[in-house]
Amino acid sequence: MASTGSQASDIDEIFGFFSDGAPPTKKPRKLLPSLKTKKPRELVLVIGTGISAAVAPQVPALKSWKGLIQALLDAAIDFDLLEDEESKKFQKCLHEDKNLVHVAHDLIQKLSPRTSNVRSTFFKDCLYEVFDDLESKMEDSGKQLLQSVLHLMENGALVLTTNFDNLLELYAADQGKQLESLDLTDEKKVLEWAQEKRKLSVLHIHGVYTNPSGIVLHPAGYQNVLRNTEVMREIQKLYENKSFLFLGCGWTVDDTTFQALFLEAVKHKSDLEHFMLVRRGDVDEFKKLRENMLDKGIKVISYGNDYADLPEYFKRLTCEISTRGRSGMVREGQLNGSSAAHSEIRGCST
């Protein structure tokens, strides 16, 4: 006997398919209560290489330290700035995974004048070559991530990054928003950022490629900030009083710059509550990371099994946090199920 339309629909639902044959929507990860109840102004977003790699995956220099150094080396070779023996030496160090900070430092020294009194440097040319035309290399899913970050910034969240690129600033400019790039060479502005007087500024703790003189690879490069007790006190107060949300960071807390700024002088570590969004991936690695980070006051949260799950997860989280920041407590279900609730927040429409 022929099935009615209603019966066919029931059968499709039982077998997990819609009438057009498409698989059902994957059930989204639930949002952690202790994170989703935060307000934007209670957060400091920490942007790592994973975000830049997701925004512009075709740019190898954005994916890792090693990728960046290789790209700088390739640029130096293309510009005929290194002798054959020198380029072979650098390639060998990269291939053998020697200390990448030292390799990068040596390469920068090779491309820079022997005296700090001279502004002219080939390093700047290589940086601009590596990060050339980033705007055209952004992918839509990556832009969704930047949109969420920008929205939280506009609602009071602070943003710092370990990345040298200015993808967030470029995206904001495309949206008609002006963000300022800060680095650790400007103590006055860093202090104002930490005091929440420059909320639409992005603090690049390693520097940003548009200001090569501000790029630092190890603590010796920013002694001016470390010696400034007022700046350091304000920076460390952020880590003690706000919740840091690590995005695309992996092992950022092991970064020497991050440790010197936020971890080494922080007292009362038992009071900390920070968060790290990561892909679940390998179960053993995930478990190890979660245990290690929890000892540091950081809750590791899985946004899904695939990198592609992050934009949608972070968008839902942004909508929830931003709505709470505006109107107090709301139920997650209201946001997940109500297009009206989403549409109140720019960039959160379904």
Curated annotation (Swiss-Prot):
Keywords: Acetylation, Nucleus, Phosphoprotein
Function recorded in the entry: May play a role in Cajal bodies formation.
Similarity comment text for this entry: Belongs to the FAM118 family.
Primary location recorded for the protein, binned into one broad class: nucleus
GO CC terms: Cajal body
Subcellular location per the Swiss-Prot or TrEMBL entry: Nucleus, Cajal body
Cystine pairings recorded for this chain: none
Pfam families associated with the record: SIR2_2
InterPro entries according to UniProt: FAM118
Protein name stated in the entry: Protein FAM118B
PTM sites of type N-acetylalanine: A2
Location of Phosphoserine modifications: S9
Name of encoding gene: FAM118B
